[in-house]
Amino acid sequence: MTDTKKTLFSAPTDEQLDTLTLTIESNLVPSISELEAIAKDWKTLGLQEADFTANAIKIAWFCYHSGSSESVQVQGNSTSDKIPLYQLAGVVRQHSTLRRFCRYFAKVIWNYALRKNQPPANWASQNYKEADRFAAFDFFEGVSSSAALSPPGGLIREPSPNERMANETNKNVHLYQTASRGSNLATTSTVATKGAYSTNASNAGFPYHRPE
């Protein structure tokens, strides 16, 4: 088996690696082909190519304040009076997810928000501390992704360790709250739930044995 592996694949030298064209591809953001498909459909709707970036930023800015989940309803105006912003967002959703799309522009949004001193509108309701309020958006990880679009001059500043921790913690809390709404308990009685949200009996106060 070992000999077969060595025959099929061998460790390349630095010189061999240098001959390869390796681009950054990440499933956190849309692929080039997905972005091209979005642009093509926007053009079919009548949007001018010169306005593509402005409208992408408009979508990402809305989601910065309102979230980019599957259930969010994008509102606002595009640069065209004939095309509402939700219609452009609908095209995005045909080829990718809104969150992946927004991640691609996260660095641009981050810089703009810092420059204008505009944290996400719902930072307080999400229980962020004031010091970490600029991290209170759900595509925050795009700010640190090398696959995201980099603004001229780079980031105004990198996210702080506390901001990263606050966002990750809030993400886990949100996932837990979402899962708890789908609890698999057959009753809502507090005798069973102990007053706690849970998707399994152990977290609700019952012993739970994972199936073999």
Curated annotation (Swiss-Prot):
Give the signal sequence positions: none
- Species of origin reads Clover yellow mosaic virus
Does the keyword Chloroplast feature in the UniProt annotation?
A: no
What's this protein's function?
Required for genome encapsidation. Forms ribonucleoprotein complexes along with TGB1 helicase and viral RNA.
- Any one Gene Ontology cellular component term annotated for this protein: helical viral capsid
Which keywords does this chain's UniProt record carry? Capsid protein, Helical capsid protein, Ribonucleoprotein, Virion
Which InterPro entries does this UniProt record tie to the protein?
Pltvir_coat (IPR000052)
Tell me which family the UniProt entry assigns to this protein: Belongs to the potexvirus capsid protein family.
Subcellular location(s) per record: Virion
Q: What is this protein called?
A: Coat protein
* MF terms (GO), sorted A to Z: structural molecule activity
Q: Which PROSITE patterns match?
A: POTEX_CARLAVIRUS_COAT
Record-linked Pfam families: Flexi_CP (PF00286)
